[in-house]
Design a protein with these regions (language model features):
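Hydrophobic structural segments
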Residues: 1-310
Length: 310
């Protein structure tokens, strides 16, 4: 006979989630944690998404969720007023009026065991992984794990830069911008550094490794150009792969949902977890430059970016 699982409170769910992704791993400037919700409220369904948007808040209510877990904190940059005439106010009013809490897990989810960066490692098959930055320590199931921002690891066998980019592209959800690559298509790759989300702040850490390519998102012109020129001068020739910011972090959602559900079950609680189907990348389509009207522009994407199936 199977024992029926109890319904957890919001406090129970948050405690379990923070066991997996401890708040103390978050950067000092971050704003991860519970944004809204009554601790004693029962939670039957949790929806996971990268961003807290008006659309994902409405989706949470439509899906019958009592908690929306996002990667990006809604109030990262704070807000003094939250009327529904503002984006952040609209999100919070929608959730609160619909009986749904809001929890953000940002840099703590980046750094943690089986977090954002390790999901990206899994997607391309990296082994022998280590934190890219100075390691923090996370205790999980009685064992200490070295964690931190970014990862560096090894591919089981050498492949070309183009093959690696194609492997990554196949693993990520569709976005209008796709991937941007700096480096020779036939460049051999075995050692890979990566950081989900915006990662140009880790360029110095990448240079200090033996990485042959760095995968990240939101690369700006000047930092990327200086990184590539420095690589040429020093002879390292580290390639770059630039992803969509939310796409690079989205692969973590399924793992986080599965692990939360499993941990709560071990504690005697049952919940349903769902993944958002909404594409939260802000870009809708691209148009290639240097192409005159009427010319073949097969590389252009003129259709709205499709929904994500995570």
């Amino acid at each position: 006979m199977t024992e029926e699982l109890a319904t957890p409170t919001l406090a129970d769910v948050v405690d379990a989630f923070h066991t997996l992704f401890p708040p103390q791993l978050a950067a000092g400037w971050d704003a991860s944690g519970l944004v809204a919700g009554r601790a004693a409220a029962p939670v039957h369904t949790v929806l996971f998404t990268v961003d807290a948007l008006a659309a994902t808040a409405e989706e949470a209510i439509a899906e019958g969720a009592q908690l929306l877990i996002t990667h990006h904190p809604l109030l990262l940059r704070g807000a003094q007023f939250i009327p529904d005439s503002t984006y952040k106010g609209e999100v919070l009013h929608t959730l609160i009026e619909g009986g749904c809490g809001l929890l953000g897990a940002h840099t703590n989810a980046d750094a943690a065991v089986e977090g954002v960066n390790e999901a990206l490692c899994d997607a391309i098959g990296l082994i022998d992984r280590e934190p890219l930055t100075e390691a923090q320590t996370q205790v999980l199931d009685g064992q200490e794990h070295a964690v931190g921002t970014g990862r560096i690891g090894t591919l089981p066998e050498e492949i070309t830069l183009k093959e690696l980019a194609e492997r990554l592209a196949a693993a990520l959800p569709p976005t209008a911008g796709g991937l941007r690559i700096a480096g020779r298509a036939d460049q051999p790759i075995r050692r890979v550094a990566l950081c989900g989300g915006a990662g140009d702040s880790l360029f110095d850490a990448v240079r200090a490794t033996d990485a042959q390519v760095y995968i990240t998102a939101d690369l700006r012109h000047h930092p990327a150009s200086e990184f590539r020129e420095t690589a040429r001068v020093t002879g390292s020739n580290i390639a770059l792969i630039d992803c969509s910011h939310p796409a690079s972090e989205s692969l973590w959602l399924r793992s986080a949902a599965d692990r939360l559900r499993k941990l709560l079950a071990e504690r005697g609680y049952g919940i349903e977890t769902k993944l958002s189907a909404l594409n939260t990348d802000p870009w809708d389509f691209t148009v290639p430059t240097g192409v005159q009207p009427g010319q073949d522009a097969h590389s252009a994407s003129t259709a709205a970016a499709p929904a994500w199936e995570l």
